Amino acid sequence: PRHILGKGKLTELEILALQGQASLIIFDGELTPAQLNSLSEVTERKVLDRTQLILDIFAQRATTRAGKLQVEMAQLKYTQPRLVGKNRAMDRLMGGIGGRGPGETKLETDRRRIRERIAKIKKELDGLRQQRAFTRARRARQGLPVAALVGYTNAGKSTLLNALTRSEVLAEDKLFATLDPTTRRLRFPEEHELVLADTVGFIRNLPKELTEAFQATLEELEAADLLLHVADASHPELDRQIAAVDGILADMELNEVPRILILNKWDRLEDEMRDILRDRWPDALPISAETRDGLNALSRCIENTIHWETTANIEITGPMPKVY
């Protein structure tokens, strides 16, 4: 309970850390504040758990105002119960009328400041949520259906968005490159058009702090008429990643929304592996967003799945990219 590991494994961990000259130890799981402190004392190294690692990655990726607010909110919620201190700075500060009374400890002051900062960020995120709700309402009045790209992180959602709409959204081969939802209009040859939304990538056992902080972003999925589930066909844990995304969508009560499974990065597979995946996922669409292979079949599938309303009252501003 105190160290997660038994004495033997703890000794083995210390030896491995010495041999590898490691200054940081990461546990693939969530540790309690007491366990983090105990492990840091025993190993004399910085210890991170899985949630803190994901939050650190998010902090590096956040560039927009909304993204930074959401990451800061998640970090504060994670940090709040883990505030500890044992030095003279934690002595009670003078407080009360005329300097009498116990006052607050520094620890209590830090916790109060965190609570105040969380309340302020919540207010700002509520403002962003209202702005996005207004945008969604305007799209609904125009009769534009919405298709949202969902999937495990680094599955190629942003690359697919760029390929379909000829945009230049940031798309990199790394985890959580996209934090904020990006929307683009997509016009089909039959004069139909829809809004295509790119969202933050999922990960198995998504930390609850992230789910709460990114609620404003994930609301884009709730307004979607179609979910395009993009999966990395070349990843060795494809099945687990698809199951993780399905589980998160089920938790968000989005099972009723029509969904298309897309096996991206098909060009990286050998013929034998392609046959295996076709048998395992017969309804999935194999594509390569990078080489644009399979995009015609995807566009036809989207057109057949979306319930198109009359486009007579849709106001079209400027030339729109087409799907070829």
Q: Where in the sequence are the language-model features?
A:
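Flexible beta-alpha connector loops of hexameric P-loop NTPases
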Residues: R2-H3, R61-R65, K106, E168-L170, ...
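Conserved P-loop NTPase architecture
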Residues: P1-V146
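Conserved C-terminal guanine-recognition region of P-loop GTPase G domains, centered on the G4
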Residues: K9-Q19, S23-K46, P189-E193, F214-P286
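Short, acidic/turn-prone active-site loops that include or flank metal/cofactor-
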Residues: T51-L55, L175-F176, A289-R292
